[in-house]
Design a protein with these regions (language model features):
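Short amphipathic alpha-helix that is part of the acyltransferase structural core
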Residues: 1-31
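Short, basic/aromatic recognition patches
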Residues: 31-37
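A short helix-loop-beta-strand connector motif used in the catalytic cores of GNAT acetyltransferases and
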Residues: 38-49
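Conserved beta-strand in the GNAT
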Residues: 49, 55-64, 71, 76
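Conserved acetyl-CoA-binding loop-helix of GNAT-fold acetyltransferases
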Residues: 77, 83-97
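Conserved GNAT acetyl-CoA-binding A-motif
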Residues: 91, 97-109
Length: 109
């Protein structure tokens, strides 16, 4: 199984809520509140996702200043893919300085 990690790849409400429901986070997130979920996605400025083919299997959803602080709010991995290191890789990629530098340059003009 090849897992592809993407930075700030656009995901739909359906993909995000589907993943939350397939992980243990669905029980603790407002998955039925469309406006809230849309705000959660839209207002996150760092989203690291894990994909197997076209299937979203993991997400690290963050708010960051791209220089010093990063708050990782949601870390979700589909239960069918847990215990394979995907969550750990999502955290590693979330902390990867090269992504911070590249994204910070896009934001600041």
């Amino acid at each position: 199984m090849a897992v592809e990690y993407k930075i700030n790849e656009e995901i739909s409400l359906k993909q995000f809520t589907g993943l939350l429901n397939r992980s243990t986070l669905g029980e603790r997130r407002p998955v039925d509140d469309v406006e809230c979920i849309q705000g959660m996605i839209s207002n996150s400025n760092l989203l690291v996702t894990a994909w197997v083919g076209s299937n979203l299997v993991g997400v690290s959803r963050c708010v960051t200043d791209f220089h010093y602080c990063c708050y990782l709010s949601d870390l979700a991995v589909d239960t069918a893919y847990q215990k394979e290191g995907i969550g750990k890789q999502l955290q590693i990629k979330t902390q990867d300085k090269k992504y911070f530098e590249a994204l910070a340059k896009k934001r600041i003009t």
